């Protein structure tokens, strides 16, 4: 996975020539979300991300991609397949293995009106570049009284994969959602990936785009509306994936799939679960969450990341502040184990929320008996 980058982005005159030849373009207006119609075909998350990048690069010459192995190798996960051949090495830039270096270059390019898309081979490596992300990209618009926009996307796989150890498995949703000036998106389906990435590239502010390695190869139904090149999803708006009346379940990224599986199991036991795909962590769609809780009177939050100071805690606080009198049961919060991710497969599974955990939590919220053996 960590093979040497095929090309190195130089400094000085070479970089200057590259940046000068990329012409800024007027940003496309944000498109309203389109209603989901009958599925026209299926698309993998990988294909959805690739097509979104391709179309946005075609529509706007100021958009360019940079990162380790994004060019000749076509990306560690093949998200940038075909883009080097189509757009050339000035817009698909292979970099050295120096996240701090190429992230700083990208932020500087965004200052000058370009629209960089920075790929991290894993978001764990974004820690090498966090000064540029937090202190440069996130704060510059505020510190310049709105005179400097930083239209940049930081994207790559986030969270647990399969047997890659503690230093390659962390979920950074809560980390980046804590920072004013950043927007944080967490796609689940192919529709999410395509619509949210397009919105992120068009946005005038820095966006952290957290993908999931285990979802890249998964296929989802996708409609003709979503395949339209003008399609984009609104940032800050959640999606109700499944309507229900007994309990609200919030989730993001891969956990949405687990929540839907749990809802199927619960329905066979007479519990109607409403599943909310958050899509956006910052801004968080508090209105949709609270409206659902006011209908179901119960809440279960799911996240893959550590429990303390997490997304679930923020959602719980929002419901306590806005809908406390509607709750008929204590909120149930499900999160990853409060330990670094183990390498052993059996321990790794125990450290990440599973479908059974969601089912048990929903039953507790609905005051349905849970066998003692199941809670052990």
From Swiss-Prot:
One Gene Ontology term of the biological-process aspect is: pyruvate decarboxylation to acetyl-CoA
Residues annotated as binding thiamine diphosphate are: 99
Supply one GO CC term from the record: mitochondrial matrix
**Which residues does the Swiss-Prot or TrEMBL entry list as transit peptide?**
1-36
Which is an annotated GO molecular function term of this record? pyruvate dehydrogenase (acetyl-transferring) activity
One Pfam family here? Transketolase_C
Question: Which cellular compartments is it found in?
Answer: Mitochondrion matrix
Enumerate the catalysed reactions.
N(6)-[(R)-lipoyl]-L-lysyl-[protein] + pyruvate + H(+) = N(6)-[(R)-S(8)-acetyldihydrolipoyl]-L-lysyl-[protein] + CO2
Q: Which domain of life is it from?
A: Eukaryota
Name the residues that bind K(+).
Answer: 152, 200-201, 203
Q: Does the keyword Ribonucleoprotein apply?
A: no
Enzyme Commission code:
1.2.4.1
Its cofactor is:
thiamine diphosphate
What does the function comment of this entry state? The pyruvate dehydrogenase complex catalyzes the overall conversion of pyruvate to acetyl-CoA and CO(2). It contains multiple copies of three enzymatic components: pyruvate dehydrogenase (E1), dihydrolipoamide acetyltransferase (E2) and lipoamide dehydrogenase (E3).
Subunit text: Tetramer of 2 alpha and 2 beta subunits.
Q: What name goes with this protein?
A: Pyruvate dehydrogenase E1 component subunit beta-2, mitochondrial
